[in-house]
Amino acid sequence: MSKAVGIDLGTTYSCVAHFANDRVEIIANDQGNRTTPSFVAFTDTERLIGDAAKNQAAMNPANTVFDAKRLIGRKFDDHEVQGDIKHFPFKVVDKASKPMIQVEYKGETKTFSPEEISSMILGKMKETAEGFLGTTVKDAVVTVPAYFNDSQRQATKDAGTIAGLNVMRIINEPTAAAIAYGLDKKSEAEKNVLIFDLGGGTFDVSLLSIEDGIFEVKATAGDTHLGGEDFDNRLVNFFIQEFKRKNKKDISTNQRALRRLRTACERAKRTLSSSAQTSIEIDSLYEGIDFYTSITRARFEELCADLFRSTLEPVDKVLSDAKIDKSKVDEIVLVGGSTRIPKVQKLVSDYFNGKEPNRSINPDEAVAYGAAVQAAILSGDTSSKTQDLLLLDVAPLSLGIETAGGIMTKLIPRNSTIPTKKSETFSTYADNQPGVLIQVFEGERAQTKDNNLLGKFELSGIPPAPRGVPQIEVTFDIDANGILNVSALEKGTGKTQKITITNDKGRLSKEEIEKMVSEAEKFKEEDEKEASRVQAKNQLESYAYSLKNTLGEEQFKSKLDASEIEEVTKAADETISWLDANQTATQEEFADQQKELESKANPIMTKAYQAGATPSGAAGAAPGGFPGGAAPEPSNDGPTVEEVD
């Protein structure tokens, strides 16, 4: 049975789950947390992912990368990307019209694509799952916002490939959450369920009908750039102004102060979901000035009022697209951490005439939960829970080609069930036209210039004929991941041409992906090497200190000459001084130092043991070898306790 997992790759937090024995297990990371911050940090010595990266963000803001999901599959000059760059403490540069993230790592300037950063987070989730399942994990279902377009989906799939995963399927987050909601409610009559998913960076609304294990998405809408981060930004800007007013100083250029303020704002926002008021206390925020202030829930709601209200537009759109009156919605399911905000809950409830939302699923874990169920189905799990489950999802945006006059001619309207295939016949615009340029767009506007160009290709070699005579059949084929293939066939000659829309301009080529896969493996090796180096250092340090402690005990003093004790103590002190001066030494150097110290200490310690001394510490504190035994090699199972920063 392959160990397939479901991964919710979130803007701010990610989560991984596994389905086995008729139930879903949300897998906790090495810190015991069931969600992992989507942060990657680069330092002079190592790369950190998850909690460790987020915890050091204030000390290293320029090299701590987050929100990669807000960049993935977008172009550098996208106005939302430009807006985000203003807030980011790390550097985003333009490379072939694609946003690339620039950081300092081990003293060198490195450039990473958003796919690579996302792949590091996916790799971390993969490791988390492997630690729990005790086996290698290859297959995964990865989720994306329902409103992600073709290039964003393709880029997310590429990130999975770079992380060494086989992405079995890309599924929409609200659909995954609907599975989490409906898995145990199979036998009930048909229900219309509205999923309202407001996360850290994206917002989706989907309306599904659930009946007898069939989950059919009727319509979907959303905003791929609205979430908790935007609420944090409002708080941060508000407090920057307050600090300016009180202290006549502008902290907006100091990245470290901003990061500390943002962390405090995020915490305050969470507190305001359960309290009416909270205080913010940051010591020495800027130029030694302490920042103590407070904020009420009412003020927070006022700061974000327009953002909160804007969440109802997609709800309207979904209901009108699905041609369903709001009174016909049986359940409203809230997903995503931001739906804990009381004002958001109230807006939704009021919109549905006072109907209370369903709170039966965990908003942080529901998406990974549903993805894990889908992963189990795709890998052939035979559980009674999953066997009759069928997912019917939709394409979020209309797809079509440009026809004469820059008109968008739609082949697949939005909210068409996928997978789907649609053909239409077109002809030439001029007499004796030798070829046609087929340009593929997605979007809802009448003119192609207002929509998003996905890709284009040429069908040439059309025999000379009057306009309107040649018949060119264009076929659009959307697969289950929501990714598009387009082909064109000239019926007279049988000439055919096809492309998978892989957004030629922004998409990584096969070679680039392969290069990134090998780089990802190299980074992983470096991470492991650094971990072994730190372990060797800790082992040497604990050995030197344990020697000193042991020699300080009375019973040892009585069994050994003062000169012997002094000799070993001096050697241990020298090692400790060497350690202080050489924190960045290699694993081999630490091992050599340990051998050297052992060669001085072992004969003397052995003599003490033969004379009957036993240390009062734990047995493990007995340094060196036992009588007649050789000194133990510094093994890799040394201290398993780490320092706390």
UniProtKB/Swiss-Prot annotation:
It is found in: Cytoplasm; Secreted, Cell wall. Keywords: Acetylation, ATP-binding, Cell wall, Cytoplasm, Nucleotide-binding, Secreted, Stress response. Its main location: cytoplasm. GO terms for biological process: chaperone cofactor-dependent protein refolding; peptide transport; protein refolding; response to toxic substance. InterPro entries: ATPase_NBD, Heat_shock_70_CS, HSP70_C_sf, HSP70_peptide-bd_sf, Hsp_70_fam. The keyword Transmembrane does not apply. Residues 611-621 have a biased composition (Low complexity). The modification N-acetylserine is found at residue 2. Residues 581-645 are annotated as: Disordered. Disruption phenotype: Does not affect cells growth and hyphal formation. Leads to high resistance to the candidacidal activity of Hst 5. GO terms for molecular function: ATP binding; ATP hydrolysis activity; ATP-dependent protein folding chaperone; heat shock protein binding; peptide binding; protein folding chaperone. The keyword Secreted applies. Induction: Expression is repressed by treatment with caspofungin. One of its GO terms (cellular component) is plasma membrane. Belongs to the heat shock protein 70 family. The regions defined by residues 128 to 135, 150 to 156 and 333 to 337 correspond to Hst 5-binding epitopes. Binds human histatin-5, an antifungal peptide from saliva. Heat shock protein that may play a role in the transport of polypeptides both across the mitochondrial membranes and into the endoplasmic reticulum. This is Heat shock protein SSA2. The lineage of its organism: Eukaryota, Fungi, Dikarya, Ascomycota, Saccharomycotina.
